[in-house]
Regions:
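Bacterial N-terminal signal peptides that target proteins for export
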Residues: 1-10
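Bacterial N-terminal signal peptides
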Residues: 9-19
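Sec-dependent signal peptide cleavage junction
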Residues: 18-26
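Flexible, acidic/histidine-containing loops and adjacent segments that form or flank the divalent-metal
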Residues: 25-52, 106-109, 124-267, 339-361
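Active-site-proximal loop/helix segments of hydrolase catalytic cores
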Residues: 50-55, 61-107, 115-135, 210-315, ...
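Short, charged/polar "capping" segments at the starts of alpha-helices
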Residues: 80-83, 150-153, 326-332
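A structural signal for isolated positions on well-ordered beta-strands in alpha/beta enzyme cores
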Residues: 113-115, 141-143, 320
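C-terminal regions of proteins
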Residues: 299-301, 306-361
Length: 361
């Protein structure tokens, strides 16, 4: 009789454990929903660029009371840091949940929200080549700016038109690997607000398409005066896609961070360049933030330092440069205006943002 009771108890325990076993082996589990906190905060990781002189990727880990939200702002070049950083994040979350033995179980999914500021290879190649197809990730949504209408009839070098090449690959990969994820494409001059697990995000679309009409003429006249047609043909598609960068501002309480993509600002004697127009349209007071990702990586000694320091950075704020050599280029310009900066050529730059403070370890 005692043996019968013993086996009945074993059978009962097995039946009770069966749902959990089935979940672990067959039903996708969101790791994000298993991470909750009473101390809301956003951890920003501007990823190391010292091994890739021109790559741009940032992770925002939004720790909320109900879940963790992972926001990927661009993704950088393929085979750079972003993909491995996300795999390591998933591994760390599993370890924190005492689930390290499930590292190879694809049912334990890390959910990602993607933002593509513009469609250049150094910003989004990792998204379509590594991150979106990865079996360990679920894409919740992709946000992107409108595509330029710049002609693709070989008037210009079409291979340099990121919207014609890399944007197409990004959308194709989304259809193949994340068919259920919504893709949000903003209209020109549109601002779009969406909630995060803590705080909120606001997207600012380019106010006009610099690839057509009078604005295309403007780009030619201002940035390529007197240049040979072959040089304009090769470089103009790059400038247009940069000028059409979408901006992103993430805020939590009184604190915020602003991403400006690769917006164009090259002339100290003009106040009507694409960067100037974005600030004028959306308003400096609306855009001003504690952390500003410097336009175009900080790749040159351009006049963007003045509007960044005087219009976009809050008092005591920090600009983030994201390319090799930026310290000697944009960094020197920022120093003229007494603006603080850090650079990812020194390694990944990490900030913790709460509703009241922004700190660096």
């Amino acid at each position: 009789m005692d043996m019968k009771r013993f086996w009945l108890c074993c059978l009962l325990l097995l039946l009770l454990a069966l749902p959990a076993l089935c979940q672990a082996e067959g039903t996708p589990v969101s790791l994000n929903d298993m991470i909750k906190t009473d101390s809301e905060r956003i951890e920003l990781r501007f990823l190391d660029s010292k091994n890739n002189a021109k790559t741009d990727a940032t992770l925002l880990l939004c720790y909320g009371k109900e879940r963790l939200e992972v926001l990927v702002v661009d993704g950088g070049l393929a085979n750079s840091r972003c993909y491995m950083e996300l795999l390591n994040l998933r591994k760390d979350l599993l370890s924190a949940l005492n689930l390290s033995d499930q590292a190879k179980n694809k049912d334990y999914q890390l959910h990602l929200t993607l933002v593509a500021t513009h469609s250049h290879k150094d910003h989004i190649a990792a998204l379509y080549s590594e991150i979106i197809p990865c079996k360990f990730f679920t894409i919740d949504a992709l946000y992107m700016p409108p595509a330029t209408a710049l002609v693709t009839d070989n008037t210009y070098d079409d291979s340099k038109n990121g919207d014609a090449i890399h944007r197409v690959r990004l959308l194709s990969t989304m259809r193949d690997s994340a068919p259920n994820a919504p893709v949000y494409t903003l209209d020109y001059a549109q601002a779009l607000i969406f909630p995060l697990a803590c705080g909120q995000a606001t997207l600012y679309a380019p106010i006009q398409d610099y690839g057509v009409g009078d604005t295309l003429t403007y780009i030619k006249n201002v940035y390529y005066p007197g240049q040979a047609d072959k040089d304009i043909r090769a470089d103009l598609p790059v400038a247009v896609v940069n000028a059409n960068s979408m901006w992103l501002r993430v805020e939590l309480g009184d604190k915020s961070v602003l991403f400006t993509g690769d917006i164009m600002k090259k002339k100290s004697d003009r106040e009507d360049e694409p960067m100037d127009r974005m600030i004028a349209h959306y308003g400096a007071e609306t855009l001003r933030s504690d952390i500003v990702k410097y336009p175009h990586h900080g790749i040159s000694r351009n006049p963007a330092a003045k509007p960044v320091s005087q219009l976009l950075l809050k008092e005591g704020g920090v600009a983030v440069l994201t390319t090799k050599g930026a310290r000697e280029k944009a960094g020197q310009m920022l120093a003229i205006y007494d603006a603080a900066f850090v650079t990812t050529e020194d390694g990944t730059q990490i900030f913790t943002m709460t509703a009241e403070s922004v700190t660096q370890p």
